[in-house]
Amino acid sequence: MTTNTVSRKVAWLRVVTLAVAAFIFNTTEFVPVGLLSDIAQSFHMQTAQVGIMLTIYAWVVALMSLPFMLMTSQVERRKLLICLFVVFIASHVLSFLSWSFTVLVISRIGVAFAHAIFWSITASLAIRMAPAGKRAQALSLIATGTALAMVLGLPLGRIVGQYFGWRMTFFAIGIGALITLLCLIKLLPLLPSEHSGSLKSLPLLFRRPALMSIYLLTVVVVTAHYTAYSYIEPFVQNIAGFSANFATALLLLLGGAGIIGSVIFGKLGNQYASALVSTAIALLLVCLALLLPAANSEIHLGVLSIFWGIAMMLIGLGMQVKVLALAPDATDVAMALFSGIFNIGIGAGALVGNQVSLHWSMSMIGYVGAVPAFAALIWSIIIFRRWPVTLEEQTQ
């Protein structure tokens, strides 16, 4: 049974399976944001010191995405997914057993290795397995898995960490990954590598100024977001002075708003990706600039989080669609670069937030993040006027 002859129901079921896998991977990527204080207390460290773990994870993904993708470019995709899930699960067992912060970081590097491959191939696989004419909706479903990781995975992981210890959070993620692995084995067909590209693809991609401009925009806007987002949990408790339960609720609200962004993109993304991305960057800029002023009210922070979540989902989806549209002949290479560049931004933002918190004041993370957000807004306006990309419509 091939991906071309199955019913629409089976095709959607396979996409949903990938969306569940995306939920699992993004839960483990995001969940340390809600556990920094608990992990710091466990190892008798400062919260900002533990936060460097976010940078290490992200930069390992950034460094290894392209090499791993090229090393596995000829590997059948179902087998590859199974292997990376085995690494993912084993690494979470080590996280659960971590007897020092160093061991925890090593276990997270193992997770990052699996992550590097997963996000290099997932978007293109979702498009391959989607029913005819439903590629944008398939990408939106994968993004919904990402959003659910924030709206359910991150808060639930935080709650588990609060009541049973942060180690149980990682153990539970490992169990969830095992169940997902069994579903992948059952549901996915053989998936020969297609349009994966090779090192020969790199010079071709690098000669596409529109694509390179999207990559630059990605790293700048993601740096802006993660400068503040990485430390939102200690910010809410230590700067705003609100309870740990409110911090959990705020993370849930921000993630839930991402689902709204996913729905908006599913309806408008095919025709208006450029406008949506620029508008979302402007919205992110406003949210970051107002983060500290909004900290005097739970309601203000809640409303801000809704718009923040919508903005980041629109940005992430819009960038992804444009990358796929601008590199249809080497989707896996292009997405490996995108994943790596995205994680450079995550690591850079977490590092900036770390340095601001240690050497200045955690209260300033929003203002500092607004600086690259403003630069990203200007750059997006410039590049979308110079290269008014409509190619995303051709991928549908």
UniProtKB/Swiss-Prot annotation:
GO molecular function term, any single one: carbohydrate transmembrane transporter activity
Entry-linked InterPro entries: MFS, MFS_dom, MFS_Efflux_Transporters, MFS_trans_sf, Sugar_effux_transptr_put
Cellular component terms per the entry's GO annotation: plasma membrane
Protein's UniProt keywords contain Transmembrane helix: yes
Keyword Iron: no
Entry keyword set: Cell inner membrane, Cell membrane, Membrane, Sugar transport, Transmembrane, Transmembrane helix, Transport
PANTHER family per record: PURINE EFFLUX PUMP PBUE, SUGAR EFFLUX TRANSPORTER
Function text: Involved in the efflux of sugars. The physiological role may be the reduction of the intracellular concentration of toxic sugars or sugar metabolites.
Similarity comment: family membership: Belongs to the major facilitator superfamily. SotB (TC 2.A.1.2) family.
Official protein name in the record: Probable sugar efflux transporter
Organism of origin: Shigella boydii serotype 18 (strain CDC 3083-94 / BS512)
Gene (UniProt): sotB
